Regions:
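Conserved Rossmann-fold NAD(P)-dependent oxidoreductase catalytic core, especially the SDR/UDP-sugar
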Residues: 4, 90-135, 161
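N-terminal Rossmann NAD(P)H-binding glycine-rich loop of SDR-like oxidoreductase domains
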Residues: 5-28
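SDR active-site strand-loop-helix element
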Residues: 11, 36, 61-67, 104-110, ...
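Adenosine-cofactor binding site in Rossmann-like domains, unifying the SAM/SAH pocket
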Residues: 26-51
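Conserved cofactor-binding/catalytic machinery of classical short-chain dehydrogenase/reductase
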Residues: 45, 60, 88, 103, ...
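NAD(P)H-binding glycine-rich loop region in Rossmannoid oxidoreductase-like domains
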Residues: 46-86, 95-98
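NAD(P)-dependent short-chain dehydrogenase/reductase
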Residues: 116-125, 150-200
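Active-site helix of classical SDR
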Residues: 137, 141
Length: 200
């Protein structure tokens, strides 16, 4: 259990999951929550991330920041998705470790599991066969973040955990017609269809 006075950094606080984490923490009485916008702190820049962690020394970190998108975005910008996600993950996780962060929660993705994994999917399926090609770059970046946390735990005794959300939607989600995930895209289409129907 975290102390109510603990300094908590939520990376990705403007996104769907990050904003939900903030709401949950505030509802539970945590008030010493640190956030930074992308303009204030570029997580892909190691020097900026190191300086931030050295100055703030957060005790707990929720790493929900990521470059995300649906199948179209993932398949059109493979290099961008891999580079940006790997850079921000490694920078934040490494800076947290170097600055004595007590616990870190890394937000992974269900796309890290093989395309043809048996259902229901088990964690042991990780790295057993091919990934889905349309989001392979994103998946590889997320696997790298998960493994880096695992290796820090094994080598240095840190308490860094990875969680894999599946099919999320909610406030602050991306409802773009071609660059969102399945559920928000469907919600948008339903809403647009209902709006057109009510105008008739």
């Amino acid at each position: 259990m975290m102390d109510k006075n603990a300094k908590i950094y939520v990376a990705g606080h403007r996104g769907m999951v990050g904003s939900a984490i903030i709401r949950c923490l505030e509802e539970q009485g945590y008030y010493n929550i640190i956030t930074r916008t992308h303009k204030e702190l570029d997580l892909c820049r190691q020097d900026e991330v190191e300086a931030f962690f050295e100055a703030e020394k957060p005790e707990y970190v929720f790493l929900a920041a990521a470059k995300v998108g649906g199948i179209v975005a993932n398949s059109e910008a493979l290099a961008d998705f891999m580079y940006e996600n790997m850079m921000l993950e490694m920078n934040v996780i490494h800076a947290a470790w170097r600055n004595g962060c007590k616990k870190l929660q890394f937000l992974g993705s269900s796309c890290i599991y093989p395309r043809m994994a048996p259902q229901p999917m088990k964690e042991s399926c990780l790295l057993t066969s091919e990934l889905e090609q349309t989001n392979e770059a994103y998946a590889l970046a997320k696997i790298s973040g998960l493994k880096y946390c695992e290796y820090l735990n094994r080598q240095y005794g840190t308490d860094y955990i990875s969680v894999m959300p599946t099919n999320l939607y909610g406030p602050n989600d991306n409802y773009h017609p071609t660059h969102s995930h399945v559920l928000p895209a469907l919600i948008r289409r339903f809403h647009e269809a209902m709006s057109r129907t009510s105008l008739m």
